């Protein structure tokens, strides 16, 4: 109750009629200052360890609650495939693992700028239906709110260019390997050079964004899309990988009292590659804690 009152007070001080995400971020930054008296430095090992321990304690507390959230993601994915297999034309999703992997791949670029439910789910499903109908992966993202393959509001988010790039890579892989070969490749390790070469063959330039390591470093195939959307696809396939979306970035920075960028905007993504790598270490340390 005290937290809600403070968030409401922060919102009112800015002239907001109801609290916004920015107001909650300010509350957490204020709370952090009250506890520690300063920001914690993620590059300082002692501060980093303190944030890891605090995070692990929060998770243990939450797991002891009646509604812990444990397993919700896996259950949602399982239920999604069960529901999709009831759609005419998608019956194979009930037991066709390769087709399921293809859907999880299509769900990655179509997630950009969208909520998982219903926008992302509808867009990925429409793309799969389009492929099964024509034999070609669609690469021209429909506008937000469009009716696609008979599905209402199955368009993509505002960043059409980013969606288009990911779909081109998937299209190239399916055309050159077939669906079964694609599924094997998507969940198998490849060098960063191979991922980059695939992107170039699909008409793109440069290595996948956010994927660190030298040209001989190994990464699962889905990372050809880049760190964020590639790991999102891995999550849908049951792999433990941290998607560094706005929610994760906010949670990570909350533990250091650093939820805002120098310009005052909310930190909604890793600020640079070193921070991205530190986030990976953070997750590993919390799991070990």
Residue ranges, per PLM feature:
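HhH-family (HhH-GPD) DNA N-glycosylase catalytic core used in base-excision repair
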Residues: 2-289
